[in-house]
Amino acid sequence: MSWRNLVDQLPVEFDPGLTDAEVERAQQRFEFQFPPDLRDFLQTALPRGPLFPDWRAGDDARLRDWLDGPRQGILFDVEENDFWHPDWNARPCMIEDALSVASEGVKAAPRMIPIFGHRMISAEPHQPGNPVYSVHQTDIIYYGFDLADYLRHEFNLPDRAAWPAKIRPIRFWSYFVQ
């Protein structure tokens, strides 16, 4: 995959890509590892704009809120819309207990890393080719079968590949798109 070729086609402003040290600093600061394809993309060029996370110089509080968005959205649906994930066993009767179980359940799930707005990719498994999701509370859908497909989809580029017969399952998150 030539990330430079794809970057050159995107109608997005870019800064120079992240250095190895900047990648390591972001990963340590926020306690996750970029999947290899996202890391390669971000090291080719760093997208710029209000809907892109700024892993180089972005506000820590804003980035932490963005990273916590999927958990907060799911907790909202647990409290307001009676959502309950089957991995969490029986739902406690008291809402405070249900929220505690749900919060721990989401924390145990693979970390979702923002790419653009509420489009996110799982940090696990740590290999290229994880699907990209659109995540809004428990309204979660695929938005690309991998990072390159997602970017072509999001920015209306031609030559999108056909969807594969099977998209890599991601622990916990694949439940929402079944």
Language model: regions and residue ranges:
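A generic structural signal for short, non-catalytic loop/turn and secondary-structure boundary residues
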Residues: 106-108, 126-128
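Extended serine/threonine-enriched, polar tracts that run as long, contiguous segments within proteins
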Residues: 118-122
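Glycine-rich, aromatic-bearing surface loops/beta-hairpins
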Residues: 127-177
